[in-house]
Amino acid sequence: MVHFTAEEKSTILSLWGKVNVEEAGGEALGRLLVVYPWTQRFFDNFGNLSSASAILGNPKVKAHGKKVLTSFGEAVKNMDNLKGAFAKLSELHCDKLHVDPENFKLLGNVMVIILATHFGKEFTPDVQAAWQKLVSGVATALAHKYH
């Protein structure tokens, strides 16, 4: 279980309140699919994923990215119980979708890059440390149901 200090929680909540979930979610998933092309196999029904511009402009990528980042908001609300907050998603990704749990770490790291891009100087090393801790905790929680 990940333990967050009061300062880390405050830091995460403060930045999360400024995140444009639709924009950042689409960018994060899009970047994941471009940088780690093997992850595209989970999105066969998304249509054209043939190039970076096709991926980043794909409405299904944007919509699913928003959905992913919206569910990440559950992590922000449930920092003290990440495993509980992500139990059903962990089961879905393990039993039905068969997603390699390593992909959760990759997406978390991409998300941190997107946040750094969006928030620039406001995304200090302390802010990054808090967010890295959160995305790592989410990746662990999502991998929890794997055998």
Curated annotation (Swiss-Prot):
Heme b binds at H64, H93. Keywords: Heme, Iron, Metal-binding, Oxygen transport, Phosphoprotein, Transport. GO terms for cellular component: blood microparticle; haptoglobin-hemoglobin complex; hemoglobin complex. GO terms for molecular function: haptoglobin binding; heme binding; hemoglobin alpha binding; metal ion binding; organic acid binding; oxygen binding; oxygen carrier activity; peroxidase activity. The modification Phosphoserine is found at S14, S51. GO terms for biological process: hydrogen peroxide catabolic process. It holds the Pfam family Globin. The keyword Transport applies. Red blood cells. The keyword Amino-acid biosynthesis does not apply. InterPro entries: Globin, Globin-like_sf, Globin/Proto, Hemoglobin_b, Hemoglobin_oxygen_transport. It comes from the Eukaryota. Residues 3-147 form the Globin domain. Belongs to the globin family. Heterotetramer of two alpha chains and two epsilon chains in early embryonic hemoglobin Gower-2; two zeta chains and two epsilon chains in early embryonic hemoglobin Gower-1. The epsilon chain is a beta-type chain of early mammalian embryonic hemoglobin. PANTHER family: HEMOGLOBIN FAMILY MEMBER (PTHR11442), HEMOGLOBIN SUBUNIT EPSILON (PTHR11442:SF7). This is Hemoglobin subunit epsilon. It comes from Eulemur fulvus fulvus. The lineage of its organism: Eukaryota, Metazoa, Chordata, Craniata, Vertebrata.
